[in-house]
């Protein structure tokens, strides 16, 4: 059956700053094309590489042992060390793909993965390592996000992520300054050292049992001006939620206080306005997470995402052999993360940065074609 609109166009995000990702876990390469970045932005492979290094696997006991260097190659869009206004293409070649362990899942979908649904949607699909649905494709997110971060950084915006929960271990609330200073000081990427130690124990325990564990990642934006966002379906928080839900294993998004607002009265959580010492409008609290009516208020923007446990586990699970159409069991082999939250942090930052870059251009805070007076 052929349906109207039966095409796939879900590999791109953004209107004026547009990022398209491509590639699969065990294909030749993964990457991104960024269209709409103004000319004149200083940009090098190192700017992108430092972000990719934060996402890179094989860096410790808390991540998959898949040892990829993840070296980025910029193919276009840069001239004499600056963007030239044309599409920026960046790729990372897959060098350590091991497809042997995936032959047994061709007809037996792994519980928690998209194997069955992708097969139902596309019939012919790359099942190795999750294919296009693998976490490895988030390299494209990070490439696009690195460019976006560099762009909005020129205008005073910073995007910082950290892990606030792993399993049932929750971090204490810390200052925005502490997040920036301490989140990268431990392998869990948690700004609360006490909680970080407990989180690490939980992750290692899950790994020892052939299991995995989920958690919560928070992203904080500082320096965003008031006025970012469009009605009604292009609200800033709507676009942020869409971008964050585009990350594999993300099952929920909160902006500001999120679902907790349901427990309160308006008199308890309304963010009241005042004038600061510089005469700028601020709010006494920030339960809205820096966004009111879908438009940024000038206060810090906060978002949280719920990340499910990595579904690839060696614990026996029930499934169906789709070739024989009979029930069976499966134990997933291969190299997998016992908790992907630490590696999701730079991906979540990238997703938010891409949305901010797009809205900064759309709202007129960044010229759409060039930076500076040259």
Curated annotation (Swiss-Prot):
Its EC number is 4.2.3.5. InterPro entries: Chorismate_synth, Chorismate_synth_AroC_sf, Chorismate_synthase_CS. GO terms for biological process: amino acid biosynthetic process; aromatic amino acid family biosynthetic process; chorismate biosynthetic process. GO terms for molecular function: chorismate synthase activity; FMN binding. Pathway: Metabolic intermediate biosynthesis; chorismate biosynthesis; chorismate from D-erythrose 4-phosphate and phosphoenolpyruvate: step 7/7. Keywords: Amino-acid biosynthesis, Aromatic amino acid biosynthesis, FAD, Flavoprotein, FMN, Lyase, NADP. Its cofactor is FMNH2. Pfam families: Chorismate_synt (PF01264). Belongs to the chorismate synthase family. This is Chorismate synthase. It comes from Methanothermobacter thermautotrophicus (strain ATCC 29096 / DSM 1053 / JCM 10044 / NBRC 100330 / Delta H) (Methanobacterium thermoautotrophicum).
């Amino acid at each position: 059956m052929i349906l109207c609109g039966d095409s796939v166009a879900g590999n791109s995000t953004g209107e004026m700053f547009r990022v398209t990702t491509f590639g699969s876990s065990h294909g030749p390469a993964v990457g991104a094309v960024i269209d709409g970045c103004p000319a004149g932005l200083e940009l090098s492979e190192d700017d992108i590489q430092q972000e990719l290094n934060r996402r890179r696997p094989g860096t410790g006991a808390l991540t998959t042992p898949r040892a990829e260097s993840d070296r980025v190659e910029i193919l276009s869009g840069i001239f004499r060390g600056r963007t030239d206004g044309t599409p920026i293409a960046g790729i990372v070649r897959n060098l350590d793909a091991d497809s042997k362990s995936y032959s047994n899942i061709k007809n037996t979908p792994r519980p928690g993965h998209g194997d069955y649904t992708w097969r139902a949607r596309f019939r012919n699909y790359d099942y190795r390592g999750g294919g296009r649905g693998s976490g490895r494709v988030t390299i494209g997110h990070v490439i696009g996000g690195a460019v976006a971060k560099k762009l909005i950084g020129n205008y005073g915006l910073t995007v910082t992520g950290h892990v606030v929960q792993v399993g049932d271990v929750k971090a204490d609330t810390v200052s925005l300054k502490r997040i920036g200073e301490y989140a990268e000081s431990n392998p869990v990427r948690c700004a609360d050292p006490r909680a970080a130690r407990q989180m690490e124990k939980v992750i290692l325990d899950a790994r020892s049992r052939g299991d995995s564990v989920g958690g919560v990642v928070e992203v904080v934006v500082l320096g965003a001006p008031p006025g970012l966002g469009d009605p009604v379906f292009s609200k800033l928080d709507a676009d942020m939620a869409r971008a964050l839900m585009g990350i594999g294993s993300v099952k929920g998004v909160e902006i500001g206080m999120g679902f907790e607002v349901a427990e309160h009265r308006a008199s308890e959580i309304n963010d009241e306005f005042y004038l600061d010492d510089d005469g700028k409008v601020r709010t006494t609290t920030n339960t809205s997470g820096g966004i009111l009516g879908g438009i940024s208020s000038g206060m810090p923007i906060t978002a949280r995402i719920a990340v499910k446990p990595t579904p690839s586990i060696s614990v026996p699970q029930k499934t169906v052999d789709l070739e024989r159409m009979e029930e069976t069991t499966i134990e997933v082999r291969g190299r997998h993360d016992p908790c992907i939250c630490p590696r999701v942090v730079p991906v979540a930052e990238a997703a938010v940065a891409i949305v901010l870059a797009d809205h900064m251009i759309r709202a007129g805070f960044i010229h759409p074609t060039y930076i500076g007076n040259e």
